[in-house]
C-alpha cells in the first residue's frame, strides 16, 4: 500500500497555507483546505488505486472557485484524475461559508512509486 499523505499535503500547501487532514471541530480560519484518503486498494501485483477527497472552504464563492482551480491544476499536474466535484449551486453552506469537495483518483505503479497519468 502506497502512503501519499505527506506528498498530497505538501502539494496543497502550495495552494493555501491552511491545510488539514480533516476539518477541525469548532471555528476555523478560512480559507481552509482539508484532504482525506478515501480508498487505497491493490489493483494487481504492480498497481494500487488511490482516491482522495479534497474539501475547499472559503468566505466567498469567488475565493472558493479560485482555490478549487488551483487545487485542480496541482492534482491533475501530479497525474490524478478528477472524478467528482460539488455543484456550484450546492457550495453555499452558511453565512459567509462556501465549500466545494473534489474527488480524485489515480493508479500508482508500486515498483516506481509513480502515478500512471490519465488513469482512473
Regions found by a protein language model. Give the residues of each.
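A common structural junction motif
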Residues: 72-80
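Short hydrophobic/aromatic beta-strand micro-patches
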Residues: 36, 55-57, 107
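Short beta-strand elements
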Residues: 19-23, 81-88
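A broad, low-specificity signal marking well-ordered, structured residues that form hydrophobic/aromatic
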Residues: 33, 52, 102
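Short, charged interaction patches at domain edges and termini
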Residues: 1-10, 26, 38-49, 86-120
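Small/polar-rich, solvent-exposed N-terminal microdomains that initiate assembly or binding
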Residues: 1-44, 62, 66-73
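Short glycine-rich, basic-tinged beta-strand/loop micro-motifs
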Residues: 45-59
Amino acid at each position: 500500500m502506497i502512503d501519499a499523505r505527506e506528498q498530497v499535503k505538501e502539494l496543497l500547501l502550495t495552494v493555501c497555507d491552511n491545510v488539514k487532514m480533516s476539518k477541525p471541530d469548532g471555528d476555523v480560519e478560512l480559507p481552509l483546505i482539508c484532504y482525506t484518503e478515501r480508498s487505497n486498494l491493490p489493483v494487481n501485483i504492480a498497481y494500487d488505486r488511490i482516491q482522495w477527497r479534497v474539501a475547499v472552504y472559503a468566505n466567498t464563492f469567488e475565493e472558493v472557485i479560485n482555490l478549487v482551480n488551483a487545487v485542480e491544476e496541482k492534482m491533475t499536474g501530479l497525474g490524478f484524475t478528477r472524478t467528482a466535484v460539488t455543484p456550484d449551486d450546492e457550495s453555499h453552506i452558511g453565512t459567509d461559508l462556501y465549500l466545494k469537495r473534489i474527488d480524485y483518483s489515480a493508479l500508482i505503479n508500486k515498483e516506481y512509486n509513480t502515478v500512471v497519468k490519465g488513469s482512473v
